[in-house]
Amino acid sequence: MVIGLSHYLTVSAILFTIGVFGIFLNRKNVIVILMSIELILLAVNINMVAFSAFLNDIVGQVFALFILTVAAAEAAIGLAILVVFYRNRGSIAVEDVNMMKG
């Protein structure tokens, strides 16, 4: 059995759907929302690499590396903001986030 483009797209669609459901079903925990965003970005990366390999073009793979870099920076900044917010408020509930000053 050969793993083809449709298999990669199916896995990507499943990951994207899980990420979207994670955002809509769990609106109380910021960490779960950040992890769901990372799942969505991972699904996009799988699509980029799958189509890049299918079309024998390296541009999709290079673009996926840029997306991974942005996702890593987003995760680091998001977690740093959460740590500071938790130290100040004692909670990371989404309801408390809209009370931030700035």
From Swiss-Prot:
GO terms for cellular component: NADH dehydrogenase complex; plasma membrane. It catalyses: a quinone + NADH + 5 H(+)(in) = a quinol + NAD(+) + 4 H(+)(out). The chain crosses the membrane at residues 5-25, 31-51, 65-85. Its main location: membrane. Keywords: Cell inner membrane, Cell membrane, Membrane, NAD, Quinone, Translocase, Transmembrane, Transmembrane helix, Transport, Ubiquinone. One of its GO terms (molecular function) is quinone binding. It holds the Pfam family Oxidored_q2. It comes from the Bacteria. NDH-1 is composed of 14 different subunits. Subunits NuoA, H, J, K, L, M, N constitute the membrane sector of the complex. Belongs to the complex I subunit 4L family. HAMAP family: NDH1_NuoK. This is NADH-quinone oxidoreductase subunit K. It comes from Agrobacterium fabrum (strain C58 / ATCC 33970).
